[in-house]
Structure formats: structure tokens, C-alpha cells
């Protein structure tokens, strides 16, 4: 395994995200002079008098999801405070467990392995969510809402304009390419992917091949994306499947045709008592994310990471376009 660095593109999102810390809700631009909110949320939900604290991790997707929850609850009349940029993977989770937050988005794969201590993933994404929801409630008193449709798991990618030439469309194809081209199949990865149980070792087990670690170059994701676009020093890259850079850099996402990667569905976590006291919240969060599939989430992420939009603006625009707010 080799570590490498390279000057990468500077995105306007960097400056935007650095300005985000703690923001308090109350005025989301969806109320008229009399305080009456517009849109379907205001018609269907009543959260007047409810005070809610939202916690979000430190990357675009989490910031967008947190803002979606905040804007939606405010449209229903709640007063919302949001704390953002908590460190991954467990900053928001720790805030929830400590009583410093009421609502936090989390991923089933993270909970299954990191919080619940399981080594073997469950292949079916919904069955894994059901197991996480059951065990986290029993062990820690944490309630999980039904998940959004998108799955932000690991993946492999390379430039779209090389697909016809290289012929790698599935991970089965990729495994065959690696074995047929010893010494050529270089891969850019983050610091843990090549060794963590739910990363490359699981893919090698499921697809029955071995990838030479000497062909791997380790760096952060900003450098990973520019490197695979340049095809130097790697011709394939580890990615997250809803990363906006996949669209921005015109990368082809290789299909995980044997479901080798563990699922990372996203749900809202709430402590059991808070969830029971506020049953409208689970329904609200499910409704506003019901149409957010991988393509939609990737596009929203790109608005922040590539276009430099603020997460709160991206979230508000999405809810308005869907008719949830006026």
C-alpha cells in the first residue's frame, strides 16, 4: 500500500462548508405575515410548540439530510436548532446518546458494525435495517425510522469514456480484469478500505479473487477522484455511491452484481421516549425522503460539493420543488 498526495481541484463548497457550525431555526422563508406555513407539510402536520435539536455529521450528505429535517419540522411549526459538522462516524450518534440532540441521521451499515459490534453483514438491505432497528432499540433505546430509498455504500468507479475500451461494468468483470491484468489494475483507496472487514476483503471473499495491495494508492477522496480521472496513478477508484463527484467527474459506477458491499441505508435515529412522544416525526421524515434514490441524492450532494451551494439552500429548494413547502 502506497500513500500519495497531489494538488487537487479546489471547490467552492469548501469555503461554504467551513462557515457552517451551529444554526438556530425559526425562519425558513416558508411562513407568511401571520405565521402560517405553506405547502403540504403545513397542511398535514402540526408540530407547534415542539422544540427539536438536530445533529449532523461533517460531510455534504449529512448536512443536506439534517437541513431537510430542520426545514420540514419548521414548516410544521416546530422550533429547531441544528448542530452541524460533528465528526464522523459517531459524532452525531454520541450527541444523541448524551441527550444533546433529539434527531440524527445515521446509516445502517455504520450502526451494524460500529455501534452494535457485528462482524458479518446481512445481505438484504431491508433485513439489515430491521435487525439494526430491533437491536439498537433493545440495547440502547434508540428508535430508527423507516429508511430512505438511497444506499450510500462503497463502490468502484472509473471514467465513462473508458467503459467501452475496458469492458468493466460489474464487479464480476472487475475481478476478471484484475486477474487477467496483473500489475496493471491499480486502485486508489482511502486509509481503511483495503483492510476493513466491510471493504475490499469482503469483496475479495464474495467475488473469489485477490487484489495485490502493492497496486493500491492511499489518499483522501478529493485526490482519489482527480487521480482516477487522470488515470494516474490509478485506473480504478474506491467511491461512495452517492458522492456528487461521480456525476461531476463523469465516472462510471461499477455494478456490485453479487451484493458484496454491506448496505448503508439512511434513517433518522431518535431516542425511544422522544419518538413515542412525537409520532408525527417518523411519518414526516419518511414522507420527505420517499423519492430520494441514489441518483437524486447524488445530484443533491453535487450541488454542495461541486457547485458550492449551501446545504440549507439545497434542502429548502428540494422540499419546495416537491411541494412540501411553499
Name each model-derived stretch.
Residues 48-61, 79-84, 183-188:
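Short, well-ordered beta-strand elements
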Residues 23-37:
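Bacterial lipoprotein signal-peptidase II cleavage site
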Residues 115-125, 130-145, 231-234, 245-258:
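Ligand-binding "clamshell"
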Residues 60-79, 197, 204-205:
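Short, polar/charged alpha-helical segment
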Residues 1-22:
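Sec-dependent bacterial lipoprotein signal peptides
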Residues 180-256:
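Ligand-binding pocket segment of bilobal, Venus flytrap-like solute-binding proteins
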Residues 154-164, 264-278:
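A bilobed periplasmic-binding-protein/Venus flytrap-type ligand-binding module shared by bacterial periplasmic
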